[in-house]
Curated annotation (Swiss-Prot):
Protein's name according to its UniProt entry: Putative pterin-4-alpha-carbinolamine dehydratase
Keyword Lipoprotein annotated: no
Organism per entry: Synechococcus sp. (strain WH7803)
EC number: 4.2.1.96
InterPro entries linked: PCD_sf, Pterin_deHydtase
HAMAP family from the UniProt entry: Pterin_4_alpha (MF_00434)
Family annotation (Gene3D superfamilies): Transcriptional coactivator/pterin dehydratase (3.30.1360.20)
């Protein structure tokens, strides 16, 4: 079961996940790809990760740009699942 991250861990996320922004109980990151096909391929890989974890992102896609927000709605903030999914997404890049 997921658990909310303690304040001490939330404060160090900028060091452990340097490409992600921490805002209002969410992790946020934006990507820009060569074209729509590359953006969609990335989203497909993320979807497979998220489905395997049963933890799904809030995201949007406009042509070659993808924005992802991670939060654990059931807990009302950032959890260890959000950090794990962010790390897995980073490993795809």
């Amino acid at each position: 079961m997921a658990s909310l991250l303690p304040q001490s861990e939330r404060e160090t996320l900028s060091n452990t996940l340097p490409h992600w922004q921490v805002e209002a109980g969410r992790l946020k990151r934006n990507w820009q790809f060569k074209d729509f096909s590359e953006a969609f391929a990335f989203m497909t890989r993320v979807a497979l990760l998220a489905e395997a974890m049963q933890h799904h992102p809030n995201w949007s896609n406009v042509y070659n740009r993808v924005s992802i927000e991670l939060t654990t709605h059931d807990l009302g903030g950032l959890s260890d699942l959000d950090v794990q999914l962010a790390r897995s997404i980073d490993a795809l890049c």
